[in-house]
Amino acid sequence: DLLLKKNLIKNQYQILDQLALDINKKYGNLSITVGIAEIINDSFFPNLYNSIALLERGEWKIIARKIILPTYEVFDEKRYFRSEEKVSVLIKQIKNKTWRLGFTICEDLWVNKNIEGRGIHKKNPISDLKKKKVDILVNLSASPYTFKKLELRSKVSSFAAKYLQVPLIYVNQIGANDN
């Protein structure tokens, strides 16, 4: 249970500090998003969020937290993480245009019960993002490989993009337990 090792979790902040500086030094005005286990310093447990950090201009900040925490099959995220209540929209000025980027983490996309046959979650980040009028949907995932899962992921992703009527940037892990 690496997520229970406080020093390991705290070390990721030092690595992010250095990575943000290195990226800025080498690439200048480049923005990068990464997934992290965000520590919350209070007396409640679990004291982590599954979060997205934005690295840019030599610094980093949290821009999104996971809303839907799966607890089925290989997933037991409620054991380690808190659930965020609100969707995250990052407003970026790029080449004289203002962009509203809606961020989701993995399961936050899986809200259409017709696709997979599972019950719909009580929370619906995709519906909430529609109210925020995002221009682009970004999903960071770390989904393990499963036979024929790519086809299902494509359907889920397509549903979200069509529902929001925006392009989707979908990023999944490689290596590790992705075979």
What are these regions (language model features)?
Residues 1-179:
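Enzyme catalytic cores with a strong preference for nitrogen-chemistry domains
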